[in-house]
Amino acid sequence: MGPPLAPRPAHVPGEAGPRRTRESRPGAVSFADVAVYFSPEEWECLRPAQRALYRDVMRETFGHLGALGFSVPKPAFISWVEGEVEAWSPEAQDPDGESSAAFSRGQGQEAGSRDGNEEKERLKKCPKQKEVAHEVAVKEWWPSVACPEFCNPRQSPMNPWLKDTLTRRLPHSCPDCGRNFSYPSLLASHQRVHSGERPFSCGQCQARFSQRRYLLQHQFIHTGEKPYPCPDCGRRFRQRGSLAIHRRAHTGEKPYACSDCKSRFTYPYLLAIHQRKHTGEKPYSCPDCSLRFAYTSLLAIHRRIHTGEKPYPCPDCGRRFTYSSLLLSHRRIHSDSRPFPCVECGKGFKRKTALEAHRWIHRSCSERRAWQQAVVGRSEPIPVLGGKDPPVHFRHFPDIFQECG
């Protein structure tokens, strides 16, 4: 048997006593002593899944009090919990009119009033501390209600319940996939994946959803609300997940790596598109000529050949072009831009093809004579000299080489 518990220090009048539960007597335990309450503001901050989990925990806690032998009447709070109402109700508030930290206060109203007010203000600023305060209060309350029947954990008939409660091992298994859940509400929500049930409908467009949180996210489309702003650029998003993905553009995070070339990407769809280079996959086919393409953008550009679409007009002369590259090349006619200079003589050209044709003038006479001899009296393709064939107009006018004799 373990060592006896040290006695609590006696309360001195005028001083704040040690934090204990509401009642110092072990037998005077009510559901309000171990329940957690939320204010209307705190309740609004909870997501639907968190509210469902909270209801399950409160129902379970109320049932455990009865299993421990405490005669506890069913409070109105439990009736509100069992109704699974999403809106906050006065039945959900602390029956003593205090915050959820009321179960952890000292003896004496006058001595502990200052600490109680400070505690309530602290919990208002940080509602998550309710969970910590609740755990501390249960640990302080549990030895006071323990009797010799439950003191020895090996002989205690409630030991299995304690083990399951403390470790949260209350599995509810899905009969379809075998996945386990801690609470029946989570299991019921999961089973809609298998059944296809969509009990939550949008009142404006009649779209249906399997979970309430999906409906709430969808309703942002109708309201136009975007409650999640980016702290870096101020752009707003409807969903928290979309904001997290967007922030990768600022952080430079690239969590998706290609297994073939180790390239990294910010988004998974970019990785999937990139991997087509390695696999050779071309999932998009042209309905007119059956050519296949790896990307939808290439297919859209190719289809302009069949449709005759020319979406790029020249702002100077109005001539239209099928591709933006052709428009860019054409606009050099209206400007003095000559971005392709010859490295031999410095002459500039507006097109790269014109530069390549010009550079044949600077070839040695032996190279040009060899090409001229090769094409005389032959019908075969012209041999490649220096990695490239002569320009087309050179083939039709071989007298251009007469300057070399």
Curated annotation (Swiss-Prot):
<dbReference type="GO" id="GO:0000981">
    <property type="term" value="F:DNA-binding transcription factor activity, RNA polymerase II-specific"/>
</dbReference>
<dbReference type="GO" id="GO:0008270">
    <property type="term" value="F:zinc ion binding"/>
</dbReference>
<feature type="zinc finger region" description="C2H2-type 4">
    <location>
        <begin position="256"/>
        <end position="278"/>
    </location>
</feature>
<feature type="zinc finger region" description="C2H2-type 3">
    <location>
        <begin position="228"/>
        <end position="250"/>
    </location>
</feature>
<keyword id="KW-0539">Nucleus</keyword>
<feature type="zinc finger region" description="C2H2-type 1">
    <location>
        <begin position="172"/>
        <end position="194"/>
    </location>
</feature>
<dbReference type="Pfam" id="PF00096">
    <property type="entry name" value="zf-C2H2"/>
</dbReference>
<comment type="function">
    <text>May be involved in transcriptional regulation.</text>
</comment>
<dbReference type="InterPro" id="IPR036236">
    <property type="entry name" value="Znf_C2H2_sf"/>
</dbReference>
<keyword id="KW-0677">Repeat</keyword>
<feature type="zinc finger region" description="C2H2-type 7">
    <location>
        <begin position="340"/>
        <end position="362"/>
    </location>
</feature>
<dbReference type="GO" id="GO:0005634">
    <property type="term" value="C:nucleus"/>
</dbReference>
<dbReference type="GO" id="GO:0000977">
    <property type="term" value="F:RNA polymerase II transcription regulatory region sequence-specific DNA binding"/>
</dbReference>
<keyword id="KW-0863">Zinc-finger</keyword>
<feature type="region of interest" description="Disordered">
    <location>
        <begin position="88"/>
        <end position="126"/>
    </location>
</feature>
<feature type="domain" description="KRAB">
    <location>
        <begin position="29"/>
        <end position="100"/>
    </location>
</feature>
<keyword id="KW-0238">DNA-binding</keyword>
<feature type="region of interest" description="Disordered">
    <location>
        <begin position="1"/>
        <end position="26"/>
    </location>
</feature>
<protein>
    <recommendedName>
        <fullName>Zinc finger protein 785</fullName>
    </recommendedName>
</protein>
<dbReference type="InterPro" id="IPR050589">
    <property type="entry name" value="Ikaros_C2H2-ZF"/>
</dbReference>
<comment type="similarity">
    <text>Belongs to the krueppel C2H2-type zinc-finger protein family.</text>
</comment>
<keyword id="KW-0479">Metal-binding</keyword>
<feature type="compositionally biased region" description="Basic and acidic residues">
    <location>
        <begin position="112"/>
        <end position="126"/>
    </location>
</feature>
<dbReference type="GO" id="GO:0006357">
    <property type="term" value="P:regulation of transcription by RNA polymerase II"/>
</dbReference>
<keyword id="KW-0862">Zinc</keyword>
<dbReference type="InterPro" id="IPR001909">
    <property type="entry name" value="KRAB"/>
</dbReference>
<feature type="zinc finger region" description="C2H2-type 2">
    <location>
        <begin position="200"/>
        <end position="222"/>
    </location>
</feature>
<keyword id="KW-0804">Transcription</keyword>
<dbReference type="Pfam" id="PF01352">
    <property type="entry name" value="KRAB"/>
</dbReference>
<feature type="zinc finger region" description="C2H2-type 6">
    <location>
        <begin position="312"/>
        <end position="334"/>
    </location>
</feature>
<feature type="zinc finger region" description="C2H2-type 5">
    <location>
        <begin position="284"/>
        <end position="306"/>
    </location>
</feature>
<keyword id="KW-0805">Transcription regulation</keyword>
<dbReference type="InterPro" id="IPR036051">
    <property type="entry name" value="KRAB_dom_sf"/>
</dbReference>
<dbReference type="InterPro" id="IPR013087">
    <property type="entry name" value="Znf_C2H2_type"/>
</dbReference>
